[in-house]
A protein has these predicted regions:
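Glycine-rich anion/phosphate-binding loop at the beta-strand->alpha-helix junction
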Residues: 109-164
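N-terminal amphipathic, basic helical "cap/leader" segment at the start of enzyme domains
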Residues: 38-47, 51
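Glycine-rich phosphate/diphosphate-binding loops that line cofactor/substrate pockets in enzymes
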Residues: 26-27, 101-106
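Short glycine-rich or small-residue beta-strand-to-loop segments that form or flank ligand, phosphate
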Residues: 18, 81-85, 110-115
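Generic N-terminal amphipathic, Lys/Arg-enriched alpha-helix
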Residues: 1-22
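Active-site cofactor/substrate anionic-group-binding motifs, chiefly glycine-
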Residues: 48-101
Length: 164
């Protein structure tokens, strides 16, 4: 097997094309490809471009809605709730972070909740960006199915890292 090195832009474009071919909308494919390429660039290979084949298969199988458009509500002054509408997580993350960025100057703290999303990947990268750029504390939550059993139990109860 040979290895080929791609630029960030080329890797991002290749991933976006694979997602588009599998049923993702243009914006969702672009945002997802960017996030996956960025995870690899930041050394988080487990949540990087290696996810493209699985995401593409899940799009083709209808497990995730490629044309979903996230909706945003503000349940309180310092919080944002995003419904990903069973779509890819990254458009929802982008929507939540954009809202949070516009609100953080007013309260110093913003919580972003994302529900009904696909795999949120390296969510912490986006939360770190918001905190660094705004000079404020930032936290994000997303749902996750039970996959981890508490100590001493054989029954899964906790999700996998749903807080960033």
């Amino acid at each position: 097997m040979s290895t080929k090195t791609l630029s960030f832009a080329a890797a991002e474009a290749l991933a976006a094309a694979a997602l588009r071919t599998s049923g993702a909308g243009a914006d969702a494919a672009r945002q997802t490809a960017h996030a996956l390429a960025r995870a690899d660039l930041d050394g988080i290979a487990s949540h990087g471009l290696s996810r493209v084949p699985a995401y593409a298969a899940q799009l083709r199988a209808g497990k995730v809605k490629g044309d979903a458009v996230p909706s945003v509500t503000r349940p309180a002054d310092a919080s944002v709730a995003v419904d990903a509408a069973d779509g890819l997580a990254y458009p929802a993350i982008a929507a939540g972070i954009a809202w949070a960025s516009s609100l953080v100057g007013k309260s110093g703290v913003v919580a972003v909740g994302i529900r009904n999303s696909h795999h949120a990947g390296a969510l912490g990268l986006f939360v770190e960006d918001l905190a660094r750029e705004a000079g404020a504390f930032a936290i994000a939550f997303t749902n996750s199915p039970a996959g981890i059993a508490p100590a001493g139990s054989g029954t899964p109860l906790f999700g996998t890292n749903p807080i960033a």
